[in-house]
Amino acid sequence: MKHHLDHDWQGNMASPRKNLGEKTKLHFFFILSFVWIFTGLIGHEPWRPLESASISQILEIIQNNQFIHPASASNDVPYYPPLYAFFGASFAKLLSPFLEIHDAARISNAMWISLTMLSIGLLTRELWGIGFGRSAGLFFIASIGLIVNIHTLTPEVAALFGFGLSLYAFSLYFRRPFRSSVILGIGLSVLFLSNGIIPFLSIFITAFFLGFFSFWKNKRYAIFLAISLLVNLSIIGPWLFLFNISDPSLFQLWINQPILNSTPNFWYNLQGIAWFSWPAFPLACLLYTSPSPRDS
């Protein structure tokens, strides 16, 4: 007598499928980012000479209420505009009952880096679609050169957000031209008010040369740039005006500072770029040669 037994042996013995939902992946990414940002951010003395200038500016704001042109102890002329120092001083005042001034000021880095990662995620989502923002964020936090520097009191941390916001504006231009022009104006303002003219010029020159390409060579792009500059001037203009009114001689000294280093070291800068962009840059080159999911 034959017996026929139906048994799904393939289904029972097969490896279980990975079934992590989008929310779970997002939660893992948030936890990883939180650990990456806050590990090593506080609990140590100021690093010298990396943090000396920023701490001097922050103390100048806290102790002397000098919000317009706080100068560092080693330099009478403010090397950087006051945006980064202002937020550092604000966090220091807010958290001073619980943390040392330098530790409390470093908490502002968490704000800048979070905003940077948000802008990178929005940029990648705009170019590649939903779900790719996390990947870009992982590439960003994997960059070796950022590990120490995001925990350092330096205005370049705020400039990262300005760059991310400006690049997001370019990616948004074709879908939302007016909104992207406002975002670009804000990004340029963050760059100028945190790190000075060089980062501002890098984005401005990029925007100028984009106008020579067929996709950007039109009247709408000219209006986009005009609105961006108008927004930018409306933000940085009041600070420049107040700086000139409060101390005209110091303002002239600041304006007449050399823009570029008199002895630039090309290979040193190239090594720095390679260090800070590893492994994000090789991965970006690999993705550039691959078709975008939006094109499929």
What are these regions (language model features)?
Residues 125-131, 166-183, 190-191:
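Membrane-interface transmembrane helices that cradle and orient dolichyl/undecaprenyl
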Residues 21-52, 59, 230-243:
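Transmembrane signal-anchor helices characteristic of membrane glycosylation enzymes that use polyprenol
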Residues 107-127, 165, 288:
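Transmembrane-helix motifs of polytopic, lipid-linked glycan transferases
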Residues 35-38, 54-79, 83, 90-93:
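Extracytosolic helix-loop segments that constitute the early lumenal/periplasmic catalytic or substrate-binding loops
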Residues 54-60, 186, 194, 199-290:
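Transmembrane-lumen/periplasm boundary regions of multi-pass, lipid-linked membrane glycan transferases
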Residues 106, 145-159:
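Short acidic/glycine- and proline-prone juxtamembrane loop motifs at membrane-interface regions
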Residues 87-107:
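Juxtamembrane segments of multi-pass membrane glycosylation machinery
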Residues 22-32, 115, 120-142:
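Transmembrane-helix signature of polytopic, membrane-embedded enzymes
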